[in-house]
Amino acid sequence: METQTQVDPSKIMQIGTGFFASKTLLTANKMGLFTLLGVSPRSGRDIQEELGLHPRSLYDFLDALVALGFLNRTGIKQTSVYSNAADSDLFLDKNKPSYMGGILEMANNRLYPFWNDLETG
């Protein structure tokens, strides 16, 4: 009897859309969000004002970071309060000696553009 191999597109989709998660993390790090939240939890409105974020995409951006496990959230929309997840707090807060976000800054500023232009280059 012949065994059929199960074909699954999940790897294709995971890799093909992997930049969604990557760019979300890189952007939050570049903005200093994790350092801001390392001081104390903040409401979405406070984060918007302190980092100059556009209100239209504010909660989508913050909640994407919650879904990815980089932030914690209590409440919803205007009552939301955000804080760093444990690993984000330890490794992505510039005020801590354990900060390793510099490699993410380099990836965002230097490497991401190279990969973005891969087909021309």
Model-derived regions: residue spans:
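N-terminal accessory segments
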Residues: 1-121
